[in-house]
């Protein structure tokens, strides 16, 4: 019964143990499930974050593009607007500046959001992807380690189970042995008790041995059981000890796993997860914070610009920007009628009483008006202050609308209901408009009153001065002298040329061969015109011109004329460009032959630009040389034009689109749509790499396109040559000495009066300013420099410093006298003059035309023609500047590239100044007496002021006098011949006619040389010119302005008109109004003047 109970207890213990082990196994499995679930939740989180940032990056990119489009929309809108021009001219108004900064901030935000998109896509999302990979990898590693730990833990529990069963078994055996031992002891005790009672009384003597053997058996059995018990007890003790030790170890292992190992296992799963995620989020925060910082920086710039909004500064900027519009005009001058010389208010006795009464009435009226106007001004100031208070109310703070709290909606609604409500807005607008209306009413009243006060005050002051009511201001300073009239510029038509081959719709090669023009006239002239006026024309060659004007220009070219040679005849740039395209489009044989079409198109397959350029060069080198010369000229021009693509919007590709169909015709059988893109690419390549494709001038002679062209038609005569001088052009390559650029001296002058220039070409200066003079642009103008700026300086507003006082005073008096009385000479002399500009025939009034006959060098410069076989002297100073250095006044402000250079030679302003200074003027002796006296004065002059101008200091006065005498004789003869032929009366000069007539007796006939071509007329034979007899490169001395003798002691009147800048005359090889004819010069001779002697001439 006891064993059965014991057996049940063993089963219960084992069942309880097994239940406990099963529970542990279940826990271990659930642990892995929990860790796996945690890992999956992290992966899902990371995946959601990646998707979120990917979508946010797309939104940021879309937002960036939207901002860029928004900014570009308005930027392109204002790029060609007036505000953009203001910005370029550094006249930026403060509101426009704020607008530009807002656009700039928009672009900045666009770039920042694009950067944010890049950070999200290439940084944050990549980091999250890496963290996801780390989570999966760490969970797998942790799971492997966890499984190993679970196996170890289960192994320990299995060992404990085994030891426990062993312990139970040995303990059961020990208990069994113990019970047997106790039973044996009881039998032994019972046996001893029986044997003790019977031994004395009952047992017989013969029964004692039998009882002794029974006792021995019991003792032996007891000993045996005792031994068995001891053995089982020892085994049970050992088993119990093992069981207890294993039990402690198992409990310790389970405790360690649950307390430490599970935590460490979770740490392994979390290894670096939070740190990596934190770095990722910090990257996101850094990007957002930097975006916010960038935004704040941009907003700070805008805020600074808003703080600098200044109406007064903008007002000054607008007035400075449009100074020609807002500057005060010239004062109205008294215009005497029919010789009336009284120019002041007369206060003689018949009108003195009336003037005095009028004076007192004005005085009373002015006092009343001033009081009334002062009250109006005070009211105006108060109204302005009220209006400013209304306009400067601080209603711009909307921070309440961005309060993120539960009461946000109530705050927003409260804000909207108070200030920005429709009722309040309407009320404030009504008050503002009412105040503005009152302000403008008072302003109008104030302006009208102040205008009236100004007019009455002027009358009052003049009457006060006339009536002698106050101290009369002493006239301590003189007024500026009258400036000369603007010389008239007259177009001289180009000589007609007749060719046997058509210019348009013909063969270009045949025309070039027939005409001798290396570049057809229409190509050269159109390109020159566009170079001067159209490089910045937006959409040139793409925007069509007027068809009527295109046809007109075309017809002129077909007649052999050049309609673009005269800059005064303004032509539409797009029409000129259309004529150029029309010429190439109408050629019988396209510029690129159809036979080479496939070869040129095949070059597009070459990806390497160098190989493509080389292949195109090999194809074009097979074309005729005349065609290559034209191609080289045209594509050099197109490349130059493309350099202004920022302004004209015509880059090489756009030009190729315009010129592709014109220059390359698609052969029959080819698909125009597919071929056109290839044609455009070929033309674009040639435009970009034209220097590498076409041969250089050394390899192929012919005209070369120059980026800097002169402003007029380039003929091969000197600026001072007369019509017909081209007949005597010497084509030999002589080496005559001529005035060099380095042999010219600069002249300093001091401003005698203030002068404000009316155009960019005229310099503005103050009285007493130091001026640097280059050369004489005309009778009345100098080319000079002031404050580092080159321009025109009026002669009568300055005092030349480095001249001899007596000579300059005498010469200036004569020049001033002639400038004032030139047109008022006797009618008989005037009737002999033509109705033409004084600048039309320079040689009519001086010997510059005769001495200006030149021989042309290969570089296009003018070399003075030798007058005698053995004369090697330099020409007199009357010789004009060479073709290389035309007058500076030729520059036209309509194009920044229209600079006065010929043949493309780019020189510094100093060299051009020094080159032109040597030709300060030409001398005109009206008769032989003046000639002889002038000759004697010039030959006896011993001044060495300009002794440093050259190294040729051994000239003999006799040889120079002989040269001058021959020149004077020729000039006088031609002058008389021209006067005999001219029969039309000269047009009167409106300005000079208003001056007082010259009181001296009429002198010889002479027109006023108001020309920038350096001609100075000397009518008085006593007024001679100084020159150095020791220099072969002497120049005209300059003049000091002096008042005419007839005006001595009299108060000078203000100038009747403001100074006018000289206009450069277009030089021409022939004159329609001249009596001296010359044969027509072909364009080839104009382009290559030394083609017969030197073939290296360039355009």
Curated annotation (Swiss-Prot):
Coiled-coil regions, chain positions: 352-392, 952-987
Polar residues bias locations: 809-820, 937-947, 1089-1099
Tissue: Highly expressed in adult and fetal brain. Expressed at low levels in kidney. Isoform 3 is expressed in the kidney but is absent in the brain.
Domain F-BAR: 19-314
Biased segments, Basic and acidic residues type: 926-936
Ribosomal protein in keyword set: no
UniProt feature, compositional bias: Low complexity: 1026-1038, 1060-1074
GO cellular component assignments: cytoplasm; cytosol; postsynapse
Keywords from the UniProt entry: Chromosomal rearrangement, Coiled coil, GTPase activation, Phosphoprotein, SH3 domain
Domain SH3: residue ranges: 744-803
Domain Rho-GAP span(s) in chain numbering: 506-694
Phosphoserine carried by residues: 817, 820-821, 837, 858, 954
InterPro entries found in the cross-reference section: AH/BAR_dom_sf (IPR027267), F_BAR (IPR031160), FCH_dom (IPR001060), Rho_GTPase_activation_prot (IPR008936), RhoGAP_dom (IPR000198), SH3-like_dom_sf (IPR036028), SH3_domain (IPR001452), SLIT-ROBO_RhoGAP (IPR051627)
PROSITE patterns the record matches: F_BAR, RHOGAP, SH3
UniProt xrefs under CDD domains: F-BAR_srGAP3, RhoGAP_srGAP, SH3_srGAP1-3
SUPFAM superfamilies given in the database record: BAR/IMD domain-like, GTPase activation domain, GAP, SH3-domain
Subunit structure: Homodimer. Forms a heterooligomer with SRGAP1 and SRGAP2 through its F-BAR domain. Interacts with WASF1. Probably interacts with ROBO1. Interacts with FASLG.
Disease cited in the entry: A chromosomal aberration involving SRGAP3 is found in a patient with severe idiopathic intellectual disability. Translocation t(X;3)(p11.2;p25).
Domain notes: The F-BAR domain mediates oligomerization, binds membranes, and induces plasma membrane protrusions.
Protein name: SLIT-ROBO Rho GTPase-activating protein 3
């Amino acid at each position: 019964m006891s064993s059965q109970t014991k057996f049940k207890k063993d089963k219960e213990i084992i069942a309880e143990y097994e239940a406990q082990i099963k529970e542990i196994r279940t826990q271990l499995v659930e642990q892995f499930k929990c860790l796996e679930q945690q890992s999956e939740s992290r992966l899902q989180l990371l995946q959601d974050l990646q998707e979120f940032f990917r979508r946010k990056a797309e939104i940021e990119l879309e937002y960036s593009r939207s901002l860029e489009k928004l900014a570009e929309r308005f930027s392109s809108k204002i790029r060609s607007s007036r505000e953009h021009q203001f910005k370029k001219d550094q006249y930026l108004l403060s509101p426009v500046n704020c607008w530009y900064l807002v656009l700039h901030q928009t672009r900045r935000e666009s770039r920042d959001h694009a950067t944010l998109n890049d950070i999200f896509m290439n940084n944050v999302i990549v980091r999250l992807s890496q963290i996801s990979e780390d989570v999966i990898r760490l969970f797998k590693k942790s799971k492997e380690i966890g499984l190993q730990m679970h196996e170890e833990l289960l192994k320990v529990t299995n060992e404990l189970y085994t030891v426990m069963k062993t312990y139970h078994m040995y303990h059961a055996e020990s208990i069994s042995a113990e019970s047997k031992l106790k039973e044996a002891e009881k039998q032994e005790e019972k046996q001893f008790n029986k044997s003790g009672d019977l031994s004395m009384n009952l047992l017989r003597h013969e029964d004692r041995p039998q009882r002794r053997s029974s006792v021995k058996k019991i003792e032996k059995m007891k000993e045996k059981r005792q031994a068995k018990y001891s053995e089982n007890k020892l085994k049970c003790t050992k088993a119990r000890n093992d069981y207890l030790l294993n039990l402690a170890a198992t409990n310790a292992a389970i405790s360690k796993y649950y307390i430490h190992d599970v935590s460490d296992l979770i740490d392994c799963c979390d290894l670096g997860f939070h740190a990596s995620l934190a770095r990722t989020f910090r990257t996101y925060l850094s990007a957002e914070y930097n975006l916010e910082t960038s935004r704040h920086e941009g907003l700070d710039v805008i805020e600074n610009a808003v703080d600098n909004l200044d109406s007064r500064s903008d007002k000054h900027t607008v007035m400075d920007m449009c100074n020609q519009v807002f500057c005060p005009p010239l004062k109205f001058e008294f215009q005497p009628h029919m010789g009336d010389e009284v120019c002041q208010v007369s206060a003689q006795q018949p009108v003195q009483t009336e003037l005095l009464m009028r004076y007192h009435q004005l005085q009373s009226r002015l006092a009343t008006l001033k009081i009334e106007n002062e009250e109006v001004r005070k009211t105006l100031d108060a109204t302005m202050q009220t209006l400013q208070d209304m306009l400067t109310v601080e209603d711009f703070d909307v921070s309440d609308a961005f309060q993120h709290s539960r009461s946000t909606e109530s705050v927003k609604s409260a804000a909207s209901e108070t200030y920005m409500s429709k009722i309040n807005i309407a009320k404030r607008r009504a008050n503002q408009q009412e105040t503005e209306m009152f302000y403008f009413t008072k302003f109008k009243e104030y302006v009208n009153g102040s205008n009236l006060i100004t007019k009455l005050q002027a009358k009052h002051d003049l009457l006060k001065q006339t009536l002698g009511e106050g101290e009369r201001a002493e006239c301590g300073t003189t007024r500026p002298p009258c400036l000369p009239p603007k010389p008239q510029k007259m177009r001289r038509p180009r000589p007609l040329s007749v060719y046997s081959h058509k210019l348009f719709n013909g063969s270009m090669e045949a025309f070039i061969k027939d005409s001798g023009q290396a570049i057809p006239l229409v190509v050269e002239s159109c390109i020159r015109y566009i170079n001067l006026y159209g490089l910045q024309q937006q959409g040139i060659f793409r925007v069509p011109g007027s068809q009527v004007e295109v046809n007109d220009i075309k017809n002129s070219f077909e007649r052999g004329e050049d309609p673009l040679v005269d800059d005064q005849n303004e032509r539409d740039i797009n029409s000129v460009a259309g004529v150029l395209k029309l010429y190439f489009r109408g050629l019988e044989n396209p510029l690129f032959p159809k036979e080479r079409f496939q070869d040129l198109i095949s070059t597009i397959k070459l990806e390497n630009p160098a190989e493509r350029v080389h292949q195109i060069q090999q194809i074009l080198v097979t074309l005729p040389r005349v065609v290559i010369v034209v191609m080289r000229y045209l594509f050099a021009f197109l490349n130059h034009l493309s350099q202004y693509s920022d302004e004209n919007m015509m880059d090489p590709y756009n030009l190729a689109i315009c010129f592709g169909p014109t220059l390359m015709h698609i052969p029959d059988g080819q698909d125009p749509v597919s071929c056109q893109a290839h044609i455009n690419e070929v033309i674009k390549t040639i435009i970009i790499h034209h220097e590498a494709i076409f041969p250089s001038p050394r390899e192929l002679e012919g005209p070369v396109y120059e980026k800097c062209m002169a402003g007029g038609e380039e003929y091969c005569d000197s600026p001072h040559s007369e019509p017909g001088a081209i007949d005597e052009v010497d084509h030999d390559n002589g080496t005559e000495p001529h005035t060099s650029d380095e042999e010219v001296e600069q002249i300093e002058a001091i401003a005698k009066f203030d002068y404000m220039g009316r155009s960019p070409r005229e310099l503005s200066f103050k009285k007493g300013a130091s001026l640097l003079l280059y050369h004489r642009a005309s009778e009345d103008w100098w080319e000079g420099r002031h404050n580092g700026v080159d321009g025109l300086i009026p002669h009568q507003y300055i005092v030349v410093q480095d001249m001899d006082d007596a000579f300059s005073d005498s010469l200036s008096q004569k020049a001033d006298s002639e400038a004032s009385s030139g047109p008022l000479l006797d009618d008989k002399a005037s009737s002999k003059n033509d109705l033409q500009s004084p600048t039309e025939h320079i040689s009519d009034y001086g010997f510059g035309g005769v001495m200006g006959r030149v021989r042309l060098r290969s570089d296009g410069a003018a070399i003075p023609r030798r007058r005698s076989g053995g004369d090697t002297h330099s020409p007199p100073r009357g010789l004009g500047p060479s073709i290389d250095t035309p007058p500076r006044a030729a520059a036209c402000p309509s194009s920044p590239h229209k600079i006065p250079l010929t043949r493309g030679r780019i020189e510094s302003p100093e060299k051009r100044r020094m080159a032109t200074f040597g030709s300060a003027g030409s001398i005109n002796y009206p008769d032989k007496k003046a000639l002889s006296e002038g000759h004697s004065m010039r030959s006896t002059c011993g001044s060495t002021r300009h002794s440093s101008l050259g190294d040729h200091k051994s000239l003999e006065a006799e040889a120079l006098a002989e040269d001058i005498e021959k020149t004077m004789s020729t000039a006088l003869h031609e002058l008389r011949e021209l006067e005999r032929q001219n029969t039309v009366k000269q047009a009167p000069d409106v300005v000079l006619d208003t001056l007082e007539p010259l009181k001296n007796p009429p002198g010889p006939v002479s027109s006023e040389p108001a020309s920038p071509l350096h001609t100075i007329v000397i009518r008085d034979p006593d007024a001679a010119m100084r020159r150095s007899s020791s220099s072969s490169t002497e120049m005209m001395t300059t003049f000091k302005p002096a008042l005419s003798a007839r005006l001595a002691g009299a108060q000078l009147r203000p100038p009747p008109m403001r100074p006018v800048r000289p206009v450069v005359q277009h030089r021409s090889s022939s004159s329609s109004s001249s009596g001296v004819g010359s044969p027509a010069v072909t364009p080839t001779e104009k382009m290559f003047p030394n083609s017969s002697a030197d073939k290296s001439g360039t355009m």
